[in-house]
């Protein structure tokens, strides 16, 4: 029985977690650090199960590409309408600045309203991240309610991936790789280079997980906050490179001095928010008793 369960989980992972050939966002160390810290934000009733699942979650949070609901599926459902023809190669971003100036009020937060205004193809092209978070919050709730602990682990990892992605400022902008501002690679220097070099020296300060009343709306607030840091990071990158011909240690020391506080803030908030989404799904499922492992 145990071997059959393990085989089923591995089969699900083979389907769900496919590495993307070209992708942007937090580096592997950041994803794992945030997920590890998120476990410790949970209430006592959830801790034993998630502590036992910690290694699984940390291992599988990076770059899952699950079979996603159709672009015009309602948040919280996976129903695929018959006229859907839009492929979704990657949905862990939303390029908010396509929709006008901050705070992007031209983009409806209601999915059906957004489709009516812009069409499915446009939404798919410029990213579905907040709605995907809503979808996978519901999927995790359903897994908790069904006592399907294998699916709980899988959906918790997928949900964590999307929530973490929402805290990377470069997942929220058309200038996702810095080329538009003539700063190619600034995204990787911020979300991977700084983490890899300095994570042992900064303190990730998390808060206890809290209940999220509207997972999709809260996801929009997360990406808005992340987007507000794009310009300060770009400015820090430009200043750090003044007088230098490369992006080596002198550059990174300068960059961290100017943008390190933003990085630590985003990592800390991401860990708290991942835990909050997990707890919210559990509460919405009726607070089922979780197995200890």
Residue ranges and their predicted role:
Residues 1-11:
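Bacterial N-terminal signal peptides that target proteins for export
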Residues 10, 35, 167, 171:
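Alpha-helical and His/Cys-centered functional microenvironments
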Residues 10-19:
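Bacterial N-terminal signal peptides
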Residues 19-158, 174-250, 254-268, 272-293:
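N-terminal, motif-rich segments that launch catalysis or mediate targeting to/interaction with membranes
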Residues 157-165:
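Extended, hydrophobic/aromatic-rich amphipathic alpha-helical segments that build helical scaffolds
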Residues 164-178:
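Catalytic Zn2+-binding segment of zinc metalloproteases
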